[in-house]
Regions:
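Charged, amphipathic alpha-helical linker segments immediately N-terminal to NTP-binding catalytic cores
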Residues: 1-5
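P-loop NTPase motor domains
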Residues: 9, 16-275
Length: 275
């Protein structure tokens, strides 16, 4: 980055170098101070020129995405394998690719389903972060994890998407538990719910289920459902055989909902790129 500074009663011209771009770089500044223009935009351009894969969070879509797209068109020769340019944009699905953040092929154990449930529920309920371990915090996470894992093992994961999980959760709990507990690997996982059901503690059970339903109901949206049920690309963005430049768009007016969903994508991307 070009720099100009005053020292010794003289103006000097120089460069600011990110010596190790693979380590974290923090850019601090007040709104409107020029963080994107002076630093972030240069990062985007230079990383594309060096042939890197990229995960770009565009808070005000499509400010940064347009820069990345146009610069990529002019520097495709920097890549050994031509990268895919992918977009996740919930505001305008016509300008978005589709991607399933809980794709069954990337889940090998029920703990993977739990991590997905944990991420989305805590992103939707920020106050739960300080209450981890509480009964009415852990219960909805476990229930959602069980539903995700059921969708993973049912018919080879054909319906394993987050919208399907939300829709199944909204059905009658008598039907949900009858289906889930018919699978041995979920029977013990859901034993606290079954004990409450068989013990006649209906109020407690409905409270547990409502703790999962109410926050997730905020995500019921045709746009979110459409984007999250497709498989246009996978989240292993730094795969040498299939590199990607992924731009995810947010909207300041809807950030409470979109940020929770994007947090799910983020957790899976982080896990996959570090393998």
């Amino acid at each position: 980055l070009r720099s100009r500074y005053y020292y010794g009663k003289t103006w000097h011209e120089g460069w600011i170098n990110a010596v190790n771009p693979f380590r974290a770089t923090i850019v601090l500044g007040t709104p409107g101070s020029g963080k994107s223009y002076t630093v972030v935009n240069s990062f985007i351009r230079q990383q594309i020129e060096k042939g890197f894969a990229m995960y770009l969070y565009d808070f005000k879509f499509d400010d940064l995405s347009s820069i990345a797209y146009n610069h990529l068109l002019n520097h495709l020769d920097a890549y050994e394998t031509r990268p895919k340019f992918c977009i996740i944009n919930f505001d305008d699905p016509r300008r978005s690719n589709r991607c399933n953040p809980i794709a069954p092929e990337f889940m090998t154990d029920i703990s993977d389903a739990y991590e997905s449930a944990y991420t989305i529920m805590l992103n939707l309920n920020k106050t739960w972060i300080q209450k981890q371990g509480d009964f009415f915090v852990d219960s909805p996470i476990i229930l959602l994890a069980a539903i995700i894992w059921y969708l993973k093992i049912y018919e080879g994961g054909k319906y394993c998407t987050f919208p399907h999980a939300i829709e199944l959760l909204c059905k009658r709990y008598e039907d949900i538990f009858t289906i889930l507990t018919s699978y041995p690997e979920l029977e013990n996982y859901l034993s606290p719910f079954m004990d409450a059901w068989k013990g006649g503690a209906q109020d407690q059970l409905q409270g547990q289920i409502a703790s999962a339903k109410i926050p997730l109901s905020r995500m019921i949206s045709p746009q979110l459902y459409w984007v999250m049920t497709g498989n246009d690309f996978t989240l292993d963005i730094n795969n040498p055989e299939d590199p990607k430049i992924l731009c995810v768009g947010n909207n300041p007016d809807r950030q409470n909902i979109y940020s929770a969903v994007l947090g799910l994508y983020n957790s899976h991307i982080t896990r996959l790129i570090n393998k």
